[in-house]
Amino acid sequence: VRIYAPTGTHKDLLAYLVRRLLENGANSSFVNRMADAEVPASDLATDPVADMAALEPYRNPTIPLPADIFADRRNSAGIDLSDPLVLEPLQERLAELENKHWVAEPTFKSGSEAEIAPINKPHDLTAEVGTRRDTLDFEVEEAITRAQAIQPGWDRLGGERRAVLLEAAADLFEEHTDDFLSLCQREAGKTLMDAVLELREAVDFLRFYANEARRQFTRPIILPGPTGEENRLSLHGRGVFSCISPWNFPLAIFIGTPAAALAAGNTVVAKPAEQTPLIAALAVRLCHEAGIPEEAFQLLPGAGEVGEMITSDPRIAGVAFTGSTQTAQAINRSLASRDGPIATLIAETGGQNAMIVDSTALPEQVTRDVVASAFQSAGQRCSALRVLYIQDDVYDEMLRMIRGGFEALTIGNPEHLATDVGPVIDPDAKSSLERHIARRKKGGRPVWRRRLHRGANAGCFVAPTIIEMDSILDLKRENFGPILHVVRYR
């Protein structure tokens, strides 16, 4: 006879007991079957491992496999990093790519001399990953000319054919998984898990927009004919789109907006973030290998001046931008001030993401979600948690548990599997975050920081930080890094 007698304080034990009662109350549970007089004791005493081994293989036809969970497109392939048979060969292949040198340059570059900028690891500023060859002013103009010339033909190709090319690109992305994972770690400072998720999101974008091309751009829509006439409505591309992407999702967002524009029949001139052009260069090359014409999807790497020149050109029919609110406003003013047709601006910008926790919340669940949201990817996500409001009744206990979870994080080289939090993207980002933390410290409110590892000074590491404050209104701008602000409310 075994007696199951959990002990603890009311606040810790109650939620635990409720979960256990729900589990044990299920019809299939051991406790429920043991109380059933019609179930023989011999059935209860069987070895569950032996029972499973004796079962015939069976697949429930109503439950789709992971690759088929989306009815209209194939799901991206995952990688089980908990399986040594998967992980160890992957790590060996990534080690072979450690010293590979990558280059990002304009799709159609001239023979003229241009600035060559080194791209270094954000976690080791002495280690060069590759080089970026910046786009010259006249090369920007020529790129837009090429894109404009081919756009009518690309649009006439039709949704079905464009979808086939985007799906071929998605397949090539998965074939080059090792290259993308290596670059995401070395150029963008992402942990291996974050790199896997980034690649999957990019592949999903390509397949999603391929499906949209088929759905919306293959057949015209038949409209009513009030007097017996036939009316057809068909959708077409607007022209040349400029896609300007950020460094925090250097693959997923970089490929997502061009995929949408290409699917709709537009051609694209893409300007990646100056910190992460190598990932973008590989993505564009694979799209060309998949059959997308070079003139239809062009890479224009460089600093912010390249983006300014692109958006000021009156031949640009639309801009898809992801980045800061200030830059989006500048692009909006630039588009409004130029002579030419009114251009579309699709801008995804920043903000302050908040979570409100009341006294009914389960502390363990809150801790797990808060630590993951605030500090995963070193807080460099537009969806990262910035401000946590906790009800006064549970504030001290909840904050104590969150600080415990925050202390358990491993900070360091993102190329190491054990790392939870890697670097921020560059020295400018690090300096900005450190200035914000210093200002909050001067205000006299509590600030908790993790200690950094030895060698952190070689890279752009910011210690995960928790800052207590009075209100979200105390924040004047988004602080894009591993910083969580907490507020007590009644």
Kindly label every feature range from the protein language model.
Residues V1, G25-N27, R133, D313-V319:
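Glycine-enriched alpha-helix->loop->beta-strand junction motifs that scaffold or abut catalytic
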Residues T7-T145, A149, R156-D171, S182, ...:
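Terminal low-complexity tails and localization/encapsulation signals of metabolic enzymes
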Residues T126, A147, R162, C184, ...:
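Residue-level signal for inorganic ion chemistry
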Residues E174-F180, I402:
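Extended, amphipathic, non-transmembrane alpha-helical segments
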Residues Q185, R215-T367, A418, Y489:
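Rossmann-like NAD(P) dinucleotide-binding subdomain of oxidoreductase/dehydrogenase enzymes
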Residues L286-I292, S312-P314, G318, T325-I472, ...:
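ALDH superfamily catalytic-core signature
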Residues I472, R477-G481:
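C-terminal lobe/hinge of AMP-binding adenylation domains
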